[in-house]
A protein has these predicted regions:
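Short cysteine clusters
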Residues: 16, 51, 97
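Short glycine/serine- and small hydrophobic-enriched flexible loop segments
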Residues: 22-26, 59-66, 122-126
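Acidic-glycine-rich active-site phosphate/pyrophosphate-binding loop
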Residues: 22-40, 91-98
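Active-site-proximal helix-loop elements at catalytic-domain edges
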Residues: 1-27
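Glycine/charged-rich beta-loop-alpha catalytic/anionic-binding loops adjacent to active sites
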Residues: 1-5, 35-43, 99-102
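Phosphate-handling active-site elements
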Residues: 27-37, 63-80
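Glycine/serine-rich anion-binding loops at beta->alpha junctions
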Residues: 40-63
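C-terminal binding/interaction regions
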Residues: 76-132
Length: 132
């Protein structure tokens, strides 16, 4: 289960995007080369925009369902990405890091944002259950 691992990584210092990618690496879902890419996706793409939990999850969806679809089916990565955002917004209203993080910093921010990491992992895990 990636959620528990991702939360562990997040609380130990990984960023929101990194913790999701690292948990997926640990589970054999994606290649370790994605972790350095995830670094700049945190903090709203380093600019306060899209939540790193969302963008880290999008990286995994792209890896699995992109041009070289790992499942060998015709599921569209872009459709999966749109579904992910829709579900995340149902749970949290927005995907904007600035709004979600509510001005918190340091350990307060970690404690506040862990919910978004958890939500993203739950959504991602559900979306990875596909029919081949």
């Amino acid at each position: 289960m990636i959620k528990d691992r991702a939360i562990q990584y997040f609380m130990s210092g990984y960023s929101c995007s990194e913790c999701i990618v690292q948990a997926c690496i640990d589970e054999g879902i994606c290649d370790e080369c994605l972790l350095p890419c995830a670094t700049t996706f945190s903090g709203g793409m380093s600019s306060g925009c899209s939540c790193g939990s969302v963008t880290g999850s999008q990286m995994i969806l792209g890896y699995l369902f992109g041009r070289a679809n790992k499942f060998g089916n015709k599921i569209s990565a872009r459709e999966k990405a749109a579904e992910f955002v829709e579900e995340f917004k149902k749970r949290n209203k927005v995907t904007c890091c600035r709004i979600l993080s509510a001005g918190f910093s340091g350990s307060e921010r970690k404690n506040h944002c862990v919910k978004f990491v958890s939500d993203a992992c739950e959504i991602l895990e559900e979306m990875m259950k596909v029919k081949v």
